[in-house]
Amino acid sequence: MSIPKGKYTTTEGMNMKINDAMRTYRLPNPTTPEDLECRWSKLLTFGDKVVVAGYYYQHNKPCYYGATYEFLTDDHSCEGAIGLRAVSEVEFEDDGHAIAWAIAQ
């Protein structure tokens, strides 16, 4: 289950379109927490959400982003299916701010 093409996730202006985020940051959708942990080092399971902080190279400036996934089934183990729900459009100065944004979604 994924968000229809062209739809925003929560608050417009703070979030990228899901398809744009998948392409820009190479985020998989759907996936599993186990797969994300092998690709990204900053991942937290937070209740029904999985939050990720990632780094994207941009010349001469830091570009950290936050992403929020939600469990798609009742299996909340590392092998449960998760779907991408929100990705920050703003670029953060560090991964801590990116995680804080993702938790707030």
Summary of predicted features, one role per range:
Residues 2-48:
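Negatively charged, low-complexity tracts enriched in Asp/Glu with abundant Ser/Thr
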Residues 11-12, 79, 100:
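Intrinsic structural disorder/low-complexity segments
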Residues 34-39, 43-97:
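Acidic, low-complexity, intrinsically disordered interaction modules
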